[in-house]
């Protein structure tokens, strides 16, 4: 029990020194405010963030949505299309174009030619698209090419 009594006076002594330490801490507090005054770094970071926002440019994604809508209005003026269906149609057209481009590039390689001409595209259309769809696509394609060359 004697050690307990010894601890109590020891605890009181630091408590008595605490006000003196608080004065020292209070004296040091203005010295610590200097780094607080140096908080210009976050403000600079904010202005740097604003500059980064100015540098950010929307990534332009090319879609066929406008053209799909125009064709829909030509065929069925009274019918609309949902955004989900429009996305499906857009991905469908991208897939078809990719298949046609791959087939046309294969044909150009087989014939050892460095360029893809309208002939390779026409043959690729006949190979990729089935039956009547290929015939209609070829006729529309030749019509578009003749219109382009005549103008």
Curated annotation (Swiss-Prot):
PTM sites of type N-methylalanine? 2
Positions bearing the Glycyl lysine isopeptide (Lys-Gly) (interchain with G-Cter in ubiquitin) cross-link: 147
Q: Where in the cell is it found?
A: Nucleus; Chromosome
Segment Disordered: which positions?
Answer: 1-54
Q: Does the keyword Cytoplasm apply?
A: no
Cysteine pairs forming cystine bridges in this chain are none
Q: N6-acetyllysine: which positions carry it?
A: 7, 12, 28, 33, 39-40
In its record, the post-translational modification comment is: Can be acetylated to form H2BK6ac, H2BK33ac and H2BK34ac. Monoubiquitinated by BRE1 to form H2BK143ub1 and deubiquitinated by UBP26. Required for heterochromatic histone H3 di- and trimethylation at H3K4me. May give a specific tag for epigenetic transcriptional activation.
InterPro entries attached to this UniProt entry: Histone-fold, Histone_H2A/H2B/H3, Histone_H2B, HISTONE_H2B_site
Tell me the residues on which N,N-dimethylalanine occurs.
2
A GO MF annotation of the entry reads: DNA binding
Ranges of biased composition (kind: Basic and acidic residues): 8-35
List every position bearing N6,N6-dimethyllysine: 13
Q: Which UniProt keywords apply?
A: Acetylation, Chromosome, DNA-binding, Isopeptide bond, Methylation, Nucleosome core, Nucleus, Ubl conjugation
Q: Does the keyword Ubl conjugation apply?
A: yes
What does the annotation say about its assembly with partners? The nucleosome is a histone octamer containing two molecules each of H2A, H2B, H3 and H4 assembled in one H3-H4 heterotetramer and two H2A-H2B heterodimers. The octamer wraps approximately 147 bp of DNA.
Name the family. Belongs to the histone H2B family.
What the protein does comes down to: Core component of nucleosome. Nucleosomes wrap and compact DNA into chromatin, limiting DNA accessibility to the cellular machineries which require DNA as a template. Histones thereby play a central role in transcription regulation, DNA repair, DNA replication and chromosomal stability. DNA accessibility is regulated via a complex set of post-translational modifications of histones, also called histone code, and nucleosome remodeling.
Q: What is this protein called?
A: Histone H2B.3
């Amino acid at each position: 029990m004697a050690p307990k009594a010894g601890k109590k006076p020891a605890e009181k002594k630091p408590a008595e020194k605490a006000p003196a330490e608080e004065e020292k801490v209070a004296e040091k507090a203005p010295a610590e405010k200097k780094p607080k005054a140096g908080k210009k770094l976050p403000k600079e970071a904010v202005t740097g963030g604003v500059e980064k926002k100015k540098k950010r440019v929307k990534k332009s994604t090319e879609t066929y949505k406008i053209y799909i809508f125009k064709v829909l209005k030509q065929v069925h003026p009274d019918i609309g299309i949902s955004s989900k269906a429009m996305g499906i149609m857009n991905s469908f057209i991208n897939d078809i174009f990719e298949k046609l481009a791959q087939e046309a590039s294969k044909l150009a390689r087989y014939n050892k030619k460095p360029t893809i001409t309208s002939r390779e595209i026409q043959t690729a259309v006949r190979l990729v698209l089935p039956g009547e769809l290929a015939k209609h696509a070829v006729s529309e394609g030749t019509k578009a090419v003749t219109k382009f060359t005549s103008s």
